[in-house]
Amino acid sequence: HADRAIEAVIQAFGLAGARIGTLIADARIVSLLRSVLPPYAIAQPCIEAAQQALAPAQQRLARERVAAIVRERARLSAALAGLAGVTHVWPSDANFLLVEFDEPARALSRLREARLLVRDFRDRPGLERALRITVGSPEQNDRLVRSLAC
């Protein structure tokens, strides 16, 4: 839908909590939004943070972080797929993986014992055996895989 494409400034720039983004939309939608937004809808500290985060040097760092996450996501996905008890790892373009386990409660218990937090998706229809695992550093991901391999 070309008239409703919304693009947020992503976490790669370290601005997830700044509530800054862009809107690409039909002129009528933009006009409507402008009519309801306060005159200073974005706080000055947020504007300054965005300007700093989007500077060329910071953009290079963000691209490097994204590349590292992509590499680590592929490595973690392969490691998880090779574990006994993992029945499916969904493909992902995000910084997390959705993983199905034959015994998700057991996997969750092991991860909690290791003081590793994951998102429990078992209460969602069709995902009754799934946990969402955020891609961490290589060391964090190795620890996660070791915890599940026991």
Give the role of each language-model region.
Residues I69-V70, A74, L80-A114:
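Conserved PLP-binding catalytic core of the aspartate aminotransferase-like
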Residues V9-G82:
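PLP-dependent aminotransferase class I/II
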Residues A5, G85-H88, L116-R122:
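A short linear hydrophobic-aromatic micro-motif
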Residues E113-A114, D123-C150:
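PLP-dependent enzyme catalytic core of the Aspartate aminotransferase-like
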Residues I24, L98-E100, T134-G136:
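Short hydrophobic/aromatic beta-strand micro-patches
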Residues G17, D93-A94, P125-R129:
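Short acidic/glycine-enriched loop/turn segments that link adjacent beta-strands
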Residues A8-Q11, D123-P125:
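Short, acidic/turn-prone active-site loops that include or flank metal/cofactor-
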Residues H1-A2:
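Active-site phosphate-binding strand-loop segment of PLP-dependent enzymes
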